[in-house]
């Protein structure tokens, strides 16, 4: 005989005067009582255990279907005891997995529109687009970070003093010690300014047989952050000047004006 708990939670006496200990969990709690909430997996475990205990109290099932149901119940109980059931929603907070890049692209209307436009094009147009993207990627890797970006206006490295220090030491010593023909220096500054302001990506060429004039042109080019080189051409010296940047942005103070201030 199983005794039930009384209202105070203690053991209940039988009519014969005997005191029996209560067995909690034999009957489901009443709706008015305060019950500690348990997870879904624990409730499932409780009902499975209760079904197994009840099956031990009743005669063994003789039918094949009844026996199969009993074996299935015992098998489920074994799985829960050994491996443990998967946690339910009430067992803990389930953090949703972060969406992958493909899922994010599919949810973005702009990406979907670009993808649909690409897929609706012919095979030749698709190859042309892919080839362009590949060449653009390789060009960025060759240029490296920041190459082609002209920041001489806000970068303190391009102040007149730093521009002068960009000139080689030998040329700086010549400019400081010698009496520089300012008219020749200003003439080359005007030519380079007029040429590269119109065609920043072109190459300026000039035939110069005078070595001192070539020296002045090299100094002006280094001050303006231009690339200069000389080579023999049919018995004469040819100067080639090119711009290392995408745009031509000369210093605010030219070399001739900087030397006048020294």
Swiss-Prot record:
Q: Which GO terms describe its molecular function?
A: nucleic acid binding
Q: Where is the composition biased (Basic and acidic residues)?
A: 146-155
Subcellular location per UniProt equals:
Nucleus
Fetch the InterPro entries from UniProt.
Answer: R3H-assoc_dom (IPR025952), R3H_dom (IPR001374), R3H_dom_sf (IPR036867), R3HDM4 (IPR039629)
Q: Which SUPFAM superfamilies match?
A: R3H domain
Query: Quick one: where's region Disordered?
Result: 1-27, 132-155
The R3H domain extends over 182-245
Which CDD domains does the record associate with it? R3H (cd02325)
Q: Which UniProt key words apply to this protein?
A: Nucleus
Gene Ontology cellular component? nucleus
One Pfam family recorded for the sequence: R3H
Entry protein name = R3H domain-containing protein 4
